[in-house]
Amino acid sequence: MPKRVLQGVVISSKTDKTVTVKVERRFKHPIYKKFIKVSKKYAAHDPNNKFQEGDKVNIIESRPISKTKTWVVINEE
């Protein structure tokens, strides 16, 4: 099974080797036909502390690195 890749924005880089990435997705409501924006936060591994708040990044699914980290930052958009 291929690993998922998501695009998002770094909203926090305060912790060592970890960034928090906010990923927004849009979908159409099945009944009301209105487009809705939903966001979710992911803790992603950043081994070199390279990314700062506001950076647009891609994250990929990986093996569990810690209790909350199962994503790794692969590159900047």
UniProtKB/Swiss-Prot annotation:
Protein family (similarity comment): Belongs to the universal ribosomal protein uS17 family.
Disulfide cysteine pairs (residue numbers): none
A Gene Ontology BP annotation from the UniProt entry: translation
Protein name: Small ribosomal subunit protein uS17
Keywords of the record: Ribonucleoprotein, Ribosomal protein, RNA-binding, rRNA-binding
Entry keyword annotation includes Chaperone: no
Gene3D superfamilies, per the entry: Nucleic acid-binding proteins
